[in-house]
Amino acid sequence: MKTKIFSFAFNRPDILQYQITSLKKFIVGEYDINIVYDTRDNQYYEQFKKICDDNDVVFHHHLSEPGGTPSFYNAQAIKWVYDTVISKEDDCYVMLLDHDMFLIDELDVHQEMSVYDIIGCLQTREKVKYVWPGLCIFKKSSVEDIEFDFYPQTVDGQILDTGGGTYKLLSNEKIKFMDTGVDYPEEYKGIDLKDEKITG
């Protein structure tokens, strides 16, 4: 089954090439890369479009509604892609990424998803659980009949950030979820995007 990768960018065209290169280097199996440029002013339109064209990846242009918060803008762009692109696809794995997430090792999505419907970075607010969409993979057929969204919201008195609406997925007993977790080392040194072992 093909993996459809969607990276959501709103600034920093200078790092997009590194993300695309790392994805092409480390994703195992059949995949498509989609870059979603979410903007209100089109400041970086030409730069993002050229990088996508040069790398033969799909470019989506989303004009978000002004007056929101960064979390709302991000959720609005993800929902737009889900409704206008993903919902029309054949069954596939869908990977959602922030524009500043980079693979640093091989990732076989088909193998990782063999027994799960969703994998991603779990967010917990008291008893409410949801998935952060900056690092998330789901099987389209597993979630398409469940009503959910990616917007921040308040649930059981808890304030949920971007991806908050995915609590409906994790509270569904049919969904098998794996938390990828996030390990924070005592001293974070970052990664060198110019290191050819990482980004070619």
Stretches with model-predicted labels:
Residues 1-22:
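N-proximal low-complexity "stem/linker" segments adjacent to membrane-targeting elements
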Residues 2, 30-33:
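Residues at the starts of beta-strands that form the adenosine-phosphate
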Residues 21-31:
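Short, acidic, metal-binding catalytic loop of nucleotide-sugar glycosyltransferases
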Residues 34-38:
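Short internal beta-strands
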Residues 41-90:
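Active-site-proximal specificity loops/subdomain of glycosyltransferases
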Residues 91-102:
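Short beta-strand-to-loop acidic/aromatic patch adjacent to the donor-nucleotide binding site
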Residues 102-169:
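Conserved catalytic core of nucleotide-sugar-dependent glycosyltransferases
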Residues 160-200:
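C-terminal catalytic/acceptor-binding lobe
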